[in-house]
Amino acid sequence: MEAKVEEKEPEPVENAGPDAPVRLTPMMEQYIEIKAANVDSLLFYRMGDFYELFFDDAVAASAALGITLTKRGKHLGEDIPMCGVPVHAADDYLQKLIAKGYRVAVCEQVEDPAEAKKRGSKSVVKRDVIRLVTPGTLTEEKLLDPAQANFLMAMGRTRGDGALALAWIDISTGTFRVAETTPDRLFADIMRVDPRELVVADSAFHDEELRPVFDLIGKAVTPQPATLFDSAAAQTRIQHYFNVATLDGFGQFSRPELSAISGAIAYIEKTQISERPPLMRPEREHEGGTLFIDPATRASLELARTMSGNRDGSLLKAIDRTVTGGGARLLAERLTAPLTSPKEIALRLDSVSWCLSEQTLCEALRLELKGVPDMPRALSRLAVGRGGPRDLGALACGFEAAGGIASLLDGALLPDELAAARESIEKMPAGFAAHLDRALADELPLLKRDGGFVREGYNSELDEMRALRDQSRRVIAGLQADYIEETGIKSLKIKHNNVLGYFIEVTANNSGAMTDTDEAKSRFIHRQTMANAMRFTTTELAELESKIANAADRALSIELAIFEELTAEAVAHADSIRAAASALSVFDVSTALAVLAEEQGYCRPHVDDSLSFNIVAGRHPVVEQALRRQAANPFVANDCDLSPQRDGGDGAIWLLTGPNMGGKSTFLRQNALIAILAQMGSFVPAGSAHIGVVDRLFSRVGASDDLARGRSTFMVEMVETAAILNQAGEHSLVILDEIGRGTATFDGLSIAWAAVEYLHEKNRCRALFATHFHEMTALSEKLERLSNVTMRVKEWDNDVIFLHEVAKGAADRSYGVQVARLAGLPEAVVNRARDVLHQLEAGETSGKADRLIDDLPLFSVMLQQEKPKPQIQAKDSELANAVAAISPDELTPREALDLIYKLKELAGKA
């Protein structure tokens, strides 16, 4: 944005408000008027080289940004709070405000202060809001994460039946999708897309049935007038936006889908004011085309973010080997929405297989891909008037890389997905690419107002203006040489002063050559006679003087015109540019997944329509990599077979028992993650994998209080379990960990027992069920499709060694006391716990509390601590005590070596 000179503020005038006896300046009157139309946004009010904020906006912004709060004038007898940010750094401040949930209205000066003065001394420079900056409508590079999409989502609803649909748009790339949903799926579908902003009709926002969903989403929800979502007017709005006479080529949309599309487009028009971001035509997603993962499962499996909200530690971070922003976003999209069509999954797997078989070629492809900038986002910035020369340069650089990739792939026998991508790359606008190469300089400025981005030789007039601007002395010297040759006057000079400007000066003795003939007089125009010299000008010199004076302005004007010409050409080729960019992202993801598979030893899964789920030597992709980084023991691979025991049968249930810290939760999660990886089209961390398509994935692993909604840990657990039991079908995969642990033992056991029976008899799905209720292992005798498996351990001298191996059978203990000891509980507490455990196991107390109290008196922990230790002869017992105190699993190699020497020394003394 160009800086403008701030106008002098006119004298105050009486405020029009009846209860406002103080006087406001015309500028402040203008501010209040504009702010009144943007009450839900912070108003960035342009004053010269700053955006100023006043009143409550200033208070909020100063706190959010950590900038000084000052004051300017008074209103209603109170000081007017004020703060400001420089225009050149506005993006940095916008980023902070958007991250904190604010929306910002950018108010610019829309006329030059000189024009305002022509209307009178008290006139205020015209200002207007040119854009509303909201979380879902960002385009600036600084405000966007290159690896994440930035979706604006709109929810549509029909009046009669209340049918729902969602439309989501990333205006930074042009992506536009729409899908129907239902009230029970609404939250899950929203969280799958993970929009930065959700726009809903104000009537729907206050709907009692939907309000809990909006409460969960929080500040990201933006209520808007219901008229924006009118499905009856949607067709006209869509036709107007896409500049088409009919929607026949768009496909068929339901009424709620039209409502959602209308709401999304209307909000973009509202926030972008006069600009129109180029969008792809809405692409419809069909129900059942992707794996349904509810929000609780998505969170517990830490697909894109960990439970604490970080990308590090997530599955996405573990598998991401992409080298472009577009590729990273496509990978994230595939991970969060795995497919359910074996045919489509196979197409993606074929691409990865081809890349693995052509590793040399793929290494060359990745080198080219590393040079691909974010073309769709550059295009979007150009289209909405926020682009710069470097955005044009990004397109040029992308075209060059695409050309290199097309050359590398020339003649290659590609699988279907990659062949289609190559075709899109080959259709990129070669003429426009060549135009950019001719027009753009090698080094490009950030801002177009700085000029210097057009290549020398592209435009002759621009070259002339630059020459005049940068080399005026040389141009004048050249013209002087021409005049000397023409007149034969060796002493002729071209000089300059502030009165005459440029002029030709000759001695009086030589002036005859310029005055003796009519032709000479018409050629050399007399300007001034001096005592010993005469001064002349020419039409040519006068024009040159004017050109020199205006050369800089003219040069910039020409460059800006060229910029607009190139921008218009880019927008005209938007579809082919986006198609080529999408194709490059496909190659990036395919090669990245091949690199991952080679690097981590992944295998190609076999995915079909069966109910099989047979994983041989499966591993947890995140934990395995973490262990490698720490140079720790290698991950222990385990099998998992939930396939039907006979043809036509239902999937199996594994009941998993074992100690805490034994690896149960890791085993459960890894199988869910393997299913997700397989269906997103990735190789998987296993020796082999045969997976019948999972249509719904449910995971209840770990829980916490939901204090904001008044839910205890147990209540959260029960709500999530209820959702699973009510929705899982035969093609579902269910992962349940320690159901019933948050309540009394018998209550928890009863609930877990009944839940397993229901999964077996009613849901009839493939399931992994981990529990510490060892009594449940008896279910294997009653339920034919249920098998007992356990995490293997070894015991040694009251300690437990976790083998992290899954084996057939059941555990009879949970080894909680040993784990407590490893966690560092005081030795007295551990010993006391061991005594209590022995009494409980020996007595089978079954609720006989009085006998238990007699056997285990209160405060016995303290009594044990306070018992005087028997006096023993150090010489006789020191070696035995030292051996007894050893905890082998807690020793480092160095400590073990030192201990051996110590024991040898003690043995010698004995």
Curated annotation (Swiss-Prot):
Molecular function, one GO term: ATP binding
Organism encoding this protein: Brucella suis (strain ATCC 23445 / NCTC 10510)
Organism domain of life: Bacteria
Binding-site residues, ATP: G658, P659, N660, M661, G662, G663, K664, S665
Coiled-coil regions listed in the entry: none
Keyword list, A-Z: ATP-binding, DNA damage, DNA repair, DNA-binding, Nucleotide-binding
NCBIfam families for the chain: mutS1, PRK05399.1
Name of the protein in question: DNA mismatch repair protein MutS
A GO cellular component annotation in the UniProt record: cytosol
Function: This protein is involved in the repair of mismatches in DNA. It is possible that it carries out the mismatch recognition step. This protein has a weak ATPase activity.
Any one Pfam family match given in the protein's UniProt record, by short name: MutS_II
Biological processes annotated in GO: mismatch repair
Origin organism lineage: Bacteria, Pseudomonadati, Pseudomonadota, Alphaproteobacteria, Hyphomicrobiales
Family under the similarity heading: Belongs to the DNA mismatch repair MutS family.
Ranges annotated as biased composition (Basic and acidic residues): 1-11
Region Disordered, annotated ranges: 1-21
